[in-house]
Amino acid sequence: MLGASSSEEEDDDFQEDHDSLPIAQVKKRSLLSGAMTPRSSSPAPSDSVSQTNSLKRNNSSSQGRRKDSVQSQTPARSARIMSNVSKPIMQNSQEFDGDEEEGEEGSTTVVGSGDECGGPALSKEEQERMKAEREEEDHKKNLQMYMFLARCIAYPFNGQQTGDMARRQMKVNKQELARIRERFTLFLKGETNIAADEAFTKAIQSYFEVFLKSERVQKVVHAGGFSQHDFREVFRLNIEKRVRSLPDIEGLSKDTVLNSWLAKFDAIIKGDETDQNRNARGRSRNPQNAMSADAVLGKEQLYDVFQQILGVKKFEHQIIFNALQLDNPDEQAAAIRREFATREEALKDPIKMKRLTPKFVVKDMETLYMDEVRMSINTLIGNLETVPVTTRGATVGKRKDKSRSRSIEDLSLFNSLKRRTSSGSLNKGDSEDGDVTLTKSDVSLALSMEVVVMEVQGLKSVQPSKIVYCTMEVDGHKLQTDHAEASKPKWDTQGDFSTKNPLPVVKVKLYTEVKSMIAFEDKELGKVIIQPTPNCARSPEWYTMTLPKSSQDQNLKIRIAIRVEKPPNLKYCGYCYCIGRNAWKKWKKRFFCLVQVSQYAFAVCSFRQKKADPTEFIQLDGFTIDYMPESDPELSAQGGKHFFTAIKEGDELKFATDDENERHLWVQALYRATGQAYKPVPPKQSTIAPKAQGFQDKASKHGMDAMIQADSINFDHDHFYSDVQRLTLDFRINEPICSLGWFSPGQAFVLEEYSARYMVRGCFRHVTLLSNLLDKADDGLLIDPALIHYSFAFCASHVHGNRCMPDRQGPEGVGTVTLEEKEKFQEIKERLRVLLEKQITNFRYCFPFGRPEGALKGTLGLLERVLMKDVVSPVPPEEVRAVIRKCLEDAALVNYTRICNEAKIEQRMGIDVSPAQRIEDMIRVTEFCIDLLKENEEHHGEAFAWFSDLLSDHSEIFWSLYSVDLDSALEVQPHDSWDSFPLFQMLNDFLLSESSLKGGIFHNKIVQQFQPLVVRYIDLMEHSIAQAIDKGFSKEKWESRKEGCATSEDIYWKLDALHTFVIDLNWPEEDFRKYLQTKMKSLTSDMISKVSDCTFTAFDSWMQRAKKSTDYMLPSEVCVQINVMFSSKSRAVRVTVDSGEYKYQSKLDETLETMLKTMESCIQEKLHGVLESVLSRLARYDEGNPIGAILNIAPKPASIFNKLKTMAGDTSAQATTTARQPLTAQQSSGQIGNSYVTFFHGCTELLRQVIIDEIWVNGLFEHWYDNQMKSINEWLTERLQQSLSATQYISLSTIVKKVYQDFSLQGIDEERLNSKTYQSISRRLQLEESNSHIQEAAINGSAQGSVFPTSLGNATAAVSNMSSMVEGAGAKMFSLFK
């Protein structure tokens, strides 16, 4: 840095104090989160100079010199230097955790030991004194840095603070994580008022178990890398996949479900009102409110922020604020101009510049370095000139919204002049002829005035009821007040005027209204003429009015308040005596104005009254202002007491004022305008103590005067900046904002302004920032890789000489590179490579669940950038892939080791652990492994999109590590144990679902490993089922079970289980899969054949026991056997053989069909045999059959016994017998039919209830019905020539009626029931019924005729004749049925 020190000893001391400081920097705007919007190019480029801020940096890289320097220091200074020990480059963050703490705790004691320093051990008092000295020196240094930062905050001119950065979210800390877990626990227990359905509760349960309770999440929370937004995004992505996979619900969109779930999630995570209020109170206690930390901050807020960062106390800030006049923009702009002038002067001294020039990687860069310094200074000057001229207290860098000081024409003139002066200033260092010549129009002023007429006193010549008013006139423009009564002449009327004359004339006249017809104007009562200046007092004053000659008032006064608003370009004005060579050649008192045309153009102008343009003016460029300790007697005799002068080569101006304080104000204003390095000092005989002197005395009292008066060029701003940046980063990391290393807009704005104003080398800034960020990353904090990427790319472009900023380049695009920058960059590059490889290796734990978003992808991109040899040549893809492959190989070991530690596999490999427990442990480990790989694909697959094959190799390596434990667990399994099959199914299903792992090394290994086990298991199951068939059916009781008997259910359950097992295996190899299918078909066919054969044999045995009487009931065992056959048939479908487009029934299926048909025929035969037996019994009642005649006697008593009773005259007995005879006869005649109906009903109910195949039962019923009707019809056809007896008729009627009704209830089709056969039977039975009624009627008629004994013979003859007639009619009727 220019003028950083005056001797080699001071250089060495200063450099050693900063040997161990971190090196970092921040990229403009993009690096610092977009906090700057430069007005023009920054003067601190990567290649541009730090105005020799790198004072003797080449010495700092020499270890030998550092050692010699340390040994030559005092014990206190040696301890201070040695306490800052740099960390090893290759050391990882886990090693840092312990080593750093030990180094920090023991640095003060170890350094002071006799072994280390070669002297006696330091006492406790000396150590405390040394510690206090170090703290005092650090605090002084912080105060000095704060002074420079305060100047940057007070008057920024290289950019402005913007709020276009991405707003950072609130950080989730350990306490907040515990509260969030507690809220979710309460929700899952149902102790909240949040309504939720089962699906949402399951989603929350999964989120709680997988995410919130994850140890990885807890570690990242401790690292400050998670915000509530990250928590919400993880939940949103999780439920989005769930909801999107669900089928659509009519009337309910999936977006509505998602929004509802997210609203409930927000309600859970925020808690109730009590929790929210507690959190709000906790944040409000924070010194810097987290809600506004990333907002655009005002100056006072920025002061407060950096007071906290640097540990500056409020009173110290106030001292610095007052001493530096931070609220005075003119003073701040003047200080900047003085800084530039000092740097330009140092630049013109080749000898000094050569001594202060740092050591470059190429010797020829020294000349380029000088050009960069000059270019940077000119850039700063250009930036300063773009700042509009402002008044004291106005916001720098922004024009006023409403200004009455300038017209539109004046502003356009000012802007054009600003451009002219700006372009001229860029070349002023190269040529003295480049000065800008001002014109009178450039220094014109535009003032605004406010004239307020308040009241009049002494008005007695006017009647109290008269109306009076006032007029105001400035430069010909008149305004009038309101009317008032003469008794109370008071107003509150303000007149606004604008003028270009700094010495305006204000005329105020008092009038009274004259209502006379002949009066042309009102009467003037008095007037006053005021000549205000911009320095006049703003308080109201009483003025004596000039009265007309005829006025009767003696002492008429008016109270007027006048305020003249100074324009922004008028910096000071007042009356002075002046004489000069080129202007104001006569010593006289004139009204002077100091006018600022631009930031670098000032002029002293003299004005006269009623003249808008200056009479004369001189541009102050090149003048030096100073006090004149002694007055000029010759000039003081003509006027003026206190002198000061402005001197320039070829011209000299002498000024004098009547007031000493006025002189001091003029000197200070001119001193600010000239930008001179020399500060005028009041003469000793001065009795005026200026306000600034009081502030400096107060600063001196607190020991801060030296740092306040120090010149900025005497400090190494590179290392100052690195310290400020490091402390700011520490402060930012500790904020409740999830910053990931990004500065807030306010912090970034101030740091950028500092680096630009004091020309900190760009590469040095970024290297320092990289070092700080890597230190934070090594400490376990989470840093955004994009932030590191920006800085690294900037440094790489600078060091390799390929930059993309034309305005910051030297000749042919090459910039200066110091030796220290290159060495630090190589060191950072190696540290960064190690860190990135470590993060990629631990990607699941550094970036859990893919958060922060895009961080892993950015890390991979940054690794590729780090591996590049230079900026132009891209790194070969194979080299990048080799590094990532190695990282993922290590990641596989890390991930599986952590899973084993979590499952405690190593501890459970002892002898006391059973083989079954080993398999259970492996199943649990397998679940962890599958979940891990699924998470990798879900959360990190996108980041590894360009390296998907490497991620697949990582998974294979992961499974290869797993296979070692798998083999160990399988080796201890017994020969007849099949507990490992679920493990294979789990692995196989997952591997088949992953296209990258399907058919891979591990997949093929487990297939070959489990194939013999599968074959042995199926063979064993086949033998077991065959034995179960033989033993089971020999003892079977044929009790109904679900779809068969106990033995068949057991057999088929085993077959189904085996079949399901083979299907669930989902064997990946096609040949063995076909073998398993064929094997299962063969096995199933054999077992079904055995079951059906045994069942059919038992069925045949049971059916041989059947009887043909109505007492016989079909056994339920037979129905169970039929069910077994149907169960066998349903399973026989699985062994059908596919052949092209057709399906052919297997032999087994045909056999079962034949058996079922045979069983159906057998049952029908046995059931039909009972009907045949009944019909045979009824045939014995035929007419003409002797046995039938005997059997028919009972049902026909009316022909004999009724006659006897009638002849006996027992009429009462006859009536009773006649009434009871039909019922008794019917009951005795229908016994045969009722017994068959009972048999029929029991069989149908049994068949319907027990047999499971309703179709088969319906078919059986239909055939049985047809056969019954056919048999009955044939039986009746055989008896067409004879009528049925009562027994035959009643039995058949009962049988036909009940059979019809029962089969109708059983679901037989109506059309089938009403067949022709049934109709024929019905007609015959109806005819028999009619015949029976006729016979009964004939019998009843003969009974009535028997009361007359004489006619008994005639009645008998009549009955005989009727009988023959009926028989003849019957013969004719029966002939119709043939």
From Swiss-Prot:
SUPFAM superfamilies, per the entry: C2 domain (Calcium/lipid-binding domain, CaLB), PH domain-like
Coiled-coil region: 121-184
Disordered, as annotated region: 1-138
Pfam families cross-referenced by the UniProt entry: C2_CAPS, MUN, PH
Species of provenance: Caenorhabditis elegans
Subcellular location: Cytoplasmic vesicle membrane; Synapse
Chief site of localization: membrane
Residue ranges occupied by any PH domain in the UniProt entry: 569-675
Acidic residues bias: start-end ranges: 7-16, 96-105
Ranges of biased composition (kind: Low complexity): 38-50
Bias-annotated ranges (Basic and acidic residues): 123-138
Name this protein carries in UniProt: Calcium-dependent secretion activator
